[in-house]
Amino acid sequence: PDGGPPNNWAAAFSPEPSWTLDQRSGQYYLHLFLAQQPDLDWNNPRVVAAMHAVLEFWIERGVDGFRADVVHCIGKDPELADMPEDLVGLPAMLQDFGPGTHDQQRAIRRLLDDKGSMVVGETYVLDTTTMASYLEGGDQLHLAFNFPALHCPWEAARWRVEIEGAN
């Protein structure tokens, strides 16, 4: 409304905002990473259908597994609310994007299960409970990278806390 970016989200790996003005359209587009990597609008049914078609294309050619990058960022806050003040400047991709993301993961899982394929997700969230939320119920990711474990000191007591936190 004021002619600037829709919110204060920051891009990862860069001091730049996660919004870039497209000169031709006069509109901003979202990229949680590089400006050359625009985010897809997973709220758009045509985008979802196209992405499912991509999966089916590769499955028909014998691919039986996929690695999904930054899957915790698929769904976005429909309000595009600002990051809280205490998180301003941190990459927006560090937030958990919530229900829309989990709904999309369930739809992808159904498609892959029907075809006998699987998906491992890169979920760069920094707590085990949030990471585990992408696995619970057996209807989202088949496997997920455990990034919280990468940041855990190599001490038995800390690992116990990390593992028990994934209940």
Enumerate the language-model features and the residues they cover:
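Conserved alpha/beta catalytic core and glycan-binding cleft of carbohydrate-active enzymes
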Residues: 1-9, 105-167
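Acidic/aromatic-lined carbohydrate-recognition and catalytic surfaces
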Residues: 1-56, 60, 72-126
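Hydrophobic residues within beta-strands of alpha/beta enzymes
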Residues: 66-68
